[in-house]
Amino acid sequence: MALSLFTVGQLIFLFWTMRITEASPDPAAKAAPAAAAAPAAAAPDTASDAAAAAALTAANAKAAAELTAANAAAAAAATARG
């Protein structure tokens, strides 16, 4: 019951905040369409950014796989010892 009341309180606060935001929009939000219309030359190189992100993701996945394998080996050794 307490969790439900807390959730209802959060929703009320969320909608209250949204109502205030809609009543007085952020000036930076008005400037966003102008920034989106910037020339393509000012845009970052998304291909190299994507390649860097893919390399980072692959490195993180490899590290996670190695850690998982090490943990599994340690758990198997501990189980074998009894």
Curated annotation (Swiss-Prot):
InterPro entries: Antifreeze_1. Residues 1-23 form the signal peptide. Belongs to the type-I AFP family. Induction: By winter conditions, at least in part by water temperatures of below 8 degrees Celsius. Detected in liver and in blood serum (at protein level). The keyword Cell division does not apply. This is Ice-structuring protein A. It is found in: Secreted. Contributes to protect fish blood from freezing at subzero sea water temperatures. Lowers the blood freezing point. Binds to nascent ice crystals and prevents further growth. The keyword Signal applies. Residues 24-44 form a propeptide. Keywords: Amidation, Antifreeze protein, Repeat, Secreted, Signal. Disulfide bonds: none annotated. One of its GO terms (molecular function) is identical protein binding. One of its GO terms (cellular component) is extracellular space. The modification Arginine amide is found at R81.
